Structure formats: C-alpha cells, structure tokens
From Swiss-Prot:
GO cellular component, one term: focal adhesion
Chain segments carrying region Disordered: 133-164
Protein name listed in UniProt: Testin
PROSITE patterns named among the record's database cross-references: LIM_DOMAIN_1, LIM_DOMAIN_2, PET
Amino acid sequence: MDLETKVKKMGLGHEQGFGAPCLKCKEKCEGFELHFWRKICRNCKCGQEEHDVLLSNEEDRKVGKLFEDTKYTTLIAKLKSDGIPMYKRNVMILTNPVAAKKNVSINTVTYEWAPPVQNQALARQYMQMLPKEKQPVAGSEGAQYRKKQLAKQLPAHDQDPSKCHELSPKEVKEMQQFVKKYKNEALGVGDVKLPCEMDARGPNPMYIPGGDRSTAAAVGAMENKTAERKKTQYSCYCCKMSMKEGDPAIYAERAGYDKLWHPACFVCSTCYELLVDMIYFWKDEKLYCGRHYCDSEKPRCAGCDELIFSNEYTQAENQNWHLKHFCCFDCDYILAGEIYVMVNDKPVCKPCYVKNHAVVCQGCHNAIDPEVQRVTYNNFSWHASTECFLCSCCSKCLIGQKFMPVEGMVFCSVECKKMMS
C-alpha cells in the first residue's frame, strides 16, 4: 500500500501543468510534459516556469516550507487539512479614482505581492521605485517575472528531498542538515523602512532617552538625536548612491542595520535579479538568491538541476553531473566513455547530433560528422574534401585556395562567377 501511495504521489507531480502551452515556444511546443528526472518539458526543453502553468498554491507551499522552523513563521499559516505550511504573502489592492466625462470610475490595481508593512503609502512608494516591468501587478509582465524568479531563485529541490530524483538515505540526511544550516545561518527576509527610522542597532523605538531626568531634558535629548539623524548621509550598499531620507529603503538583518539598499538594488550578487519577495541569503558580505547561495556551497548537476550530495560525480565542460545524469540531452543515452558534442552547453551523443544538429554540406548535401574537418563561411559549411569544397562552375578543388563566395556557392575566379550569373 505504501509503494502504491508513493507511485501515485510521483505521478501527480508529473501531471501538474500537463499540456500547458509554452509562453516561449508558442505553437512549436505540444504542451508541457515534465521529463522524468530533468526539470524541463520533454517536448520543447523549456522549464515549467516558461509554461502557462498556474502554480500559486504550489509556490506558496514551497515558500511556506522554506520559512518553516525559522524566525519567519509569522509569514506562514498551516492548513488545517494536512498541516502543510503555506506562505502568507501580502497582496496589496490599490484603488485610484479615474475622472471620466460623466462620472468618476474606480481603477483597481492588484499587486500579487507587496512588502508586509502596515504603512500602505510606504508599500506603494516601494513599488514605484521598482522598474515597471518588474512590478508584480496581477496579469502583467511584472507578475510573470515574479513567477519565473520564484521558480528560478527558490527551487523546491534545493530544500525538499522528496522533490529530488532517487536520493540515497545518506544523501537525504546530508541534504536535511544542509537545509537546516542555511536556514539558521543565511536565510533572511528584507525589511522596508525609512532610513531615518533605523540606526546601526536596528529599528529605533519611540522612546524618551534619559528616563531618570526631567521631562524637559529628555525631550531635548530626543530632539538632538532627531537632528543628528537628519544630518546623516545615507547611501545604498549596492550602487553607493545617496538615498533620500523620505524614500523607502531595504534592510537585511543578517547584513547588519548599518547597510541599506534601494528597492531596485536589492538583488542577487550573482544573477543581479531582484530578490523575489525580498527573500535573501547572506554570505561573505554579499546578498544571494537561494539558487546561487546553494551553488556557492554545493556542486549542482547540470542534468537534473539538483545539488549534488554524493562524493562521486562527473566534471565535464566546466560543469558538474551526477554519474547517472551525464547523458545525451536529446535521448538520455549515458555518455560515459562515449563521443559527444556540446550543443548550447548541453552534451549530445553522436547519432543525435548528426540527426538533429549537424550542419549540412553545401557540396554533397549530407550532414557533416562532428569528427570530420569542415570549411565554414558565414552560415554555409562544406566537407573539407576534394569531393565537396569545389568551384560551383568548373569543379576545381578550393582547399587552400582563394575563393569567391556567393550565397551558398563558391567560385575560383571572376570568370567562373560570371558564367554562373
């Protein structure tokens, strides 16, 4: 019965989003179909985030699990039905009156995520300081951008062993320890406040210093401290540019409250993308998204996109691979000890290369074997042989000779070119 349940769960994972159209490939993709162990579509090779798949609940579960057993449990709620932690993302709805000729209509804007601050004006300011194409307005390019970054920056398989492919019990234990470590030492969520509300010790509470002195002296001390803060020059930790005192700033607790960022500068130090929902990882005085923090700690398999917890793995083409995942990108044939060709940074076996990727010789019109020498000019190629690289008029061999190219033809002389024109 347990085995049946496990198989059913695995099947449900592969049914999610099945048949959804690809937003990148359009009609070229037959619809989303998840590869058995790669995190891509079997039909078009794009990721799930490139397809029109409704993932809001799944993403909320993923982020909820990330915050479980951390100080950020206030951002999650457990469902009564199954106890799964769900991310309580802050949705902001703004209503703006729009003047029309006869009456006034109401224009409503919904942000699929907004910083969880009580001051809605501050949240609105924060959104306005982001590039328009990255503002998560429902149904917009910005909402699609947020969806992609949730998938890219916070892969479920970087925190949940059940989302990985065939981990051994030892690897599961190592992964659980790794996740616990980064939750305790690196994970954080940015905080939006005005620069004048903070100092190097953290948020400034509203208090009157010198409680044992007279009220007048205490008020004077408070005014002096306020005046000092107004003179303070605030600059962004990322771009080093100055910050206006009345503009929202982002603070990262793990970085220390002496550092602050412009909203548009709160980015991963590796991919330079906005840190989705201000979720960051702090290491060596730098901000990282979840993916690139994990990459700085563990090798990642270029085949399945999972972190490698095994001591034995393959290194090829400046990438890392699980031993069983160094396979042809087209047919999944294991490439250990085999001839392969790299196509767009993906290894492809020789038969698949010849069938799907090889260039065609302009002379014999056959595919050019990857191990055979060729002559290439612009987008045209020839076998580097006396049978193929010939003058298109007189059939003189042109290897090592000067030639005149005309589209897919080559000529040995002006005379031959004129005869064919």
